[in-house]
Amino acid sequence: MRKILVIWLIFIMNIYSEIPSGKLPSVFWLGLSDSEKVSFVNGAYGAISLLKNSHKNEVRKQYLHNKNWIQPYYIERFYDIADEYLSEEAGYNLKIIVLHMDALYANSDNHKIPVLEAMRVVSLMQDGLRDKANLRLLQLQRKY
């Protein structure tokens, strides 16, 4: 579990370390080749899925013996947020996510939005949750 957490933290730090150096997330994203973008999205999907499954297994191990235990809301919410980053409609065709992220970063209002947050908005849109995706996009535009 610690290995996964360390890998996840290194992954996040690498993504967000681009911002202090003056490099915008959109410049980072648009500077990648198409195959690098697909690999990036594939890696992010894999890391999020692994993190979620590992957490489920650890919770199961910890509370397996307690029959009165009920899963708290914050754990369900954590899983829901993790699912927002993964598009089920796109399936294994990650090129769709890449093309939509390119389109998202084409708008100058979105240049400062972090790459993972952009992936979250695109995944929500792909899954048909347009209202939620638009609300999240407006929040991110206001924040960044």
Regions found by a protein language model. Give the residues of each.
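Compact alpha-helical subdomains of small soluble proteins
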Residues: 19-23, 54-144
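Immediate post-signal-peptide N-terminus of mature secreted/exported proteins
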Residues: 18-54
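Enrichment for repetitive, rod-forming helical segments
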Residues: 9-10, 44, 127
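Sec-dependent N-terminal signal peptides
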Residues: 4-13
